[in-house]
């Protein structure tokens, strides 16, 4: 048995916030109390003769495990970057107990076999590993997957993350189907036709490197389109990793128009912590899609978190090898890790600054 004493227990789902003691028996919470261990033993017959490990949590917060709905564990196919086992260890170190993997592996999670591989390997870890399936076969944007089958086999949502779905007719069909099934569709909002070099904001950062970069219009245009499709179809939409102030405002207005509450949006720790100055300073280590933008965008994202426009913090944990990140800025892949640092970044940049309470962050 485990006895956690003197901790501050926070449960955001119920707005619970008290200093209490917690008794855990066989891996499950048996009792939450302000009584002492001896008093609790006298009340609980099943724990009188059991050995009890005691953890003094004075000055610490005890909370439910964190959930990250947007991670890349690179497994199968790209395991020199990360695999499900190492990704799970990183998640647990960061306080996460559940994650949702993206489908852009090799092969893509668009079939029963790959889905089963991911779920079976995830089940061998100490983490709750869930996964999305792709919206389109091979992330091609051309042919829909069998959503019914993949959902029945364990997928928890659908996304072509990493690649936008440019065919609006196909997207609308997919979102109608997802609405029928009651599952979310998560969309990567960057129109590649408007981007000269991804991962670097068109502005001060792109000028520093003498390249074309990625303009905010690439994100704005697709967020605007996809919100309209979601409102028409009634689908549950998750707008992934917002980077622009205009994108935040579009989501804010769409939420006001949604009578079902099906519009959701996520922000990453790097987008509420950093701006394009980090790309100038750190180069490829701060290169990600969508890119870090201006300070005004970072502040707008924080405002979106404060007023509930952005209702998800997701890491977009996306590891690469050191060799890949050592390439020139126009050749290095976009992506940054985040599972081990997300909570501390939230506490430092949102809680300690007075933007959110600990409960709101969690």
Model-predicted regions and their roles:
Residues 1-46:
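N-terminal metal-binding scaffold of metallo-dependent hydrolase/deaminase domains
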Residues 39-62:
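Active-site metal-binding motif and surrounding structural segment of the metallo-beta-lactamase
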Residues 106, 161-246, 267, 312, ...:
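Divalent metal-binding pocket/active-site signature
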Residues 57-122:
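Metal-associated gating/positioning segment near the N- to mid-region
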Residues 208-236, 285, 306, 312-313, ...:
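His/Asp/Glu-enriched, well-ordered alpha-helical/loop segment
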Residues 111, 171, 192-206, 222, ...:
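Histidine/acidic-residue-rich catalytic or RNA/ligand-binding cores of hydrolases
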Residues 85-109, 125-137, 151-166, 182-186, ...:
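Divalent metal-dependent hydrolysis catalytic cores, especially in the metallo-beta-lactamase
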Residues 7, 22, 27, 59, ...:
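Divalent metal-coordination and catalytic microenvironments
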């Amino acid at each position: 048995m485990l006895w956690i004493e003197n901790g501050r227990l926070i449960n955001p789902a119920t707005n619970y916030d008290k200093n209490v003691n917690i008794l855990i028996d066989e891996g499950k919470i048996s009792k939450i109390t302000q009584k002492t261990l001896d008093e609790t033993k006298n009340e609980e017959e099943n724990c009188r003769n059991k050995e009890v490990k005691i953890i003094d949590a004075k000055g610490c917060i005890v909370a439910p495990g964190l959930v990250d709905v947007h991670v890349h564990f690179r497994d199968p196919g790209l395991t020199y970057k990360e695999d499900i086992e190492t990704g799970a260890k990183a998640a647990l170190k960061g306080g996460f107990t559940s994650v949702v993997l993206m489908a852009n592996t090799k092969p893509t999670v668009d079939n029963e076999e790959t889905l089963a591989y991911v779920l079976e390997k995830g089940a061998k870890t100490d983490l709750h590993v869930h996964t999305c399936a792709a919206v389109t076969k091979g992330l091609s944007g051309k042919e829909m997957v069998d959503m019914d089958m993949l959902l029945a086999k364990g997928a928890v949502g659908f996304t072509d993350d990493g690649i936008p779905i440019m065919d609006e007719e196909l997207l609308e069909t997919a979102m109608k189907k997802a609405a029928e099934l009651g599952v979310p569709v998560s969309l990567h909002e960057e129109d590649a036709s408007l981007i000269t070099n991804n991962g670097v904001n068109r502005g001060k950062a792109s000028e520093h490197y003498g390249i074309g970069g990625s303009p905010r219009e690439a994100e704005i245009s697709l967020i605007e389109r996809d919100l309209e499709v979601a409102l028409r179809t009634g689908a549950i939409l998750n707008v992934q990793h917002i980077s622009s102030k205009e994108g935040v405002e579009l989501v804010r207005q769409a939420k006001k128009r949604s009578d079902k509450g099906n519009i959701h949006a996520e922000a990453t720790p790097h987008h509420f912590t950093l701006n394009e100055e980090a790309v100038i300073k750190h180069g490829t280590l701060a290169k990600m899609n969508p890119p870090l933008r201006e300070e005004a965008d970072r502040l707008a994202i924080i405002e979106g978190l404060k007023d509930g426009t952005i209702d998800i913090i997701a890491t977009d944990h996306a590891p690469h090898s050191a060799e890949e990140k050592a390439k020139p800025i126009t050749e290095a892949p976009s992506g940054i890790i985040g599972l081990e640092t997300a909570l501390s970044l939230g506490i430092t940049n949102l809680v300690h600054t007075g933007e959110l309470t600990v409960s709101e962050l969690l």
